[in-house]
């Protein structure tokens, strides 16, 4: 059953201005100041935009085939103390990127082998080439239905295709985008993650406003 969304009471001209600010990556608070609307109104409008994006991205979630880069990453949390894999207070996420194509990203409970393998099997066609780094959870791919290529970051020499630069670049873009919000509640993190996925998959930037306007139907 499709969930019905309430029609916005904002004038179409105001909605269009807020859409432009959202696509530009401006925070809701700043957008409120620039458009002259109430701050809470802008916050709610941006929240609804992200909910629409999550719904649409779920509908077009790709089933990937060919050369696929996979990687987990960790977002947020305090900067002090342990960093990287398993860092306390951080949100673990997992991503799959088809080279020259789309990315799929999601929050995960943990980065254990069976967790990651389950997602890979759900989203990647058997016999695809799967590139990973040397994290031990990916060892299960060595005896799977996929062709596993492991990347060793400690080696200075990198073969032309032996890398996961694409998915790492996506993580960098996503973290840079989220950093401007000065902390995202975990309960809403998936909305922002899917926003980053949408921005990547529907680039270049000029297409984002067109796509989102069609989804919102202002």
Model-inferred region functions:
Residues 1-218:
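Residue-level recognition of single "structural anchor" positions
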């Amino acid at each position: 059953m499709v969930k019905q969304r309430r029609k916005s009471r904002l004038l179409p001209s105001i909605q269009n201005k807020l859409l432009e600010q959202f696509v530009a990556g401006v925070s809701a608070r700043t957008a409120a100041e620039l458009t002259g609307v109430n701050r809470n109104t802008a916050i709610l409008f941006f929240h609804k935009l992200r909910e629409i994006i999550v719904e649409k991205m779920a509908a077009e979630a790709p089933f990937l085939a060919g050369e696929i880069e996979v990687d987990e990453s960790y977002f947020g949390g305090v900067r002090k103390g342990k960093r990287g894999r398993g860092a306390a207070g951080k949100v673990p996420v997992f991503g799959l990127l088809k080279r020259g194509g789309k990315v799929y990203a999601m929050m995960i409970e943990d980065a254990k082998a069976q967790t990651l393998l389950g997602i890979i099997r759900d989203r990647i066609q058997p016999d695809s080439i799967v590139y990973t780094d040397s994290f031990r959870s990916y060892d299960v791919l060595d005896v799977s239905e996929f062709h596993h290529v492991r990347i060793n970051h400690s080696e200075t020499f990198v073969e032309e295709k032996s890398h996961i630069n694409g998915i790492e670049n996506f993580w960098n873009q996503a973290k840079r985008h989220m950093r401007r919000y000065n902390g995202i509640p975990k309960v809403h993190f998936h909305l922002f993650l899917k926003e980053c996925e949408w921005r990547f998959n529907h680039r270049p930037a000029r297409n984002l406003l067109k796509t989102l306007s069609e989804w919102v139907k202002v």
